A protein has these predicted regions:
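Extreme N-terminal tail/first-helix region
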Residues: 1-35
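Short beta-strand segments
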Residues: 40-74
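Short hydrophobic/aromatic beta-strand or adjacent loop that forms the aromatic wall/cage
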Residues: 42, 140-142
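Short strand-connecting beta-turns/loops that link adjacent beta-strands
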Residues: 65-67, 101, 150
Length: 151
């Protein structure tokens, strides 16, 4: 059995785990779920479905580049990008929760030298991204979340 077959079979369980993570993160205002032992730091990304228009939340590993937050749209090395990536492409202005802080952000895809620099930064946060890159033929997007003025 290859990796993708195993991941496909376990996807319903993974969705329940992610929903539980999100619920605990929100219920504790980030006290539990933001930074846990042996895990990379996690934020909650709010996004609107590109097709459905439904509001969704995804717990995602993140890194920091100055004031910006950085995400990797790896989906574990699947052949397709994660749904949240398509949703951000359609609706780039959104909100994230980092610990107890809620931040209005604008999403964009990093390219060229910036992408390579941020990829290296994120591999430092979570080394598994290199394994994911080897599993897929697609270029895994690096997403930059730039803070937006509030008000």
């Amino acid at each position: 059995m290859d990796y993708l077959d195993l991941a496909d079979r376990n996807w319903p369980l993974l969705r329940r785990v992610m929903a539980g993570h999100t619920a605990v993160y929100r219920a504790t205002n980030g006290a539990i779920g933001h930074r846990m032992p042996f895990f990379a730091p996690t934020l909650l990304l709010d996004h609107v479905g590109a097709k459905s228009g439904k509001r969704r939340t995804s717990p995602l590993v993140y890194g920091r580049d100055g004031a910006n937050l950085v995400l990797i749209a790896s989906k574990g090395g699947y052949p397709k990008n994660p749904a949240w990536f398509y949703n951000l492409t359609a609706h780039p202005d959104t909100t994230v929760q980092v610990g107890s802080e809620r931040i209005d952000v604008h999403a964009r895809v990093a390219t060229g030298e910036e992408r390579e620099r941020l990829w290296a930064l994120m591999v430092g946060v979570y080394g598994g991204y290199e394994d994911y890159r080897k599993r897929t033929d697609r270029e895994i997007p690096v997403v930059v979340l730039e803070p937006r003025p509030t008000g």
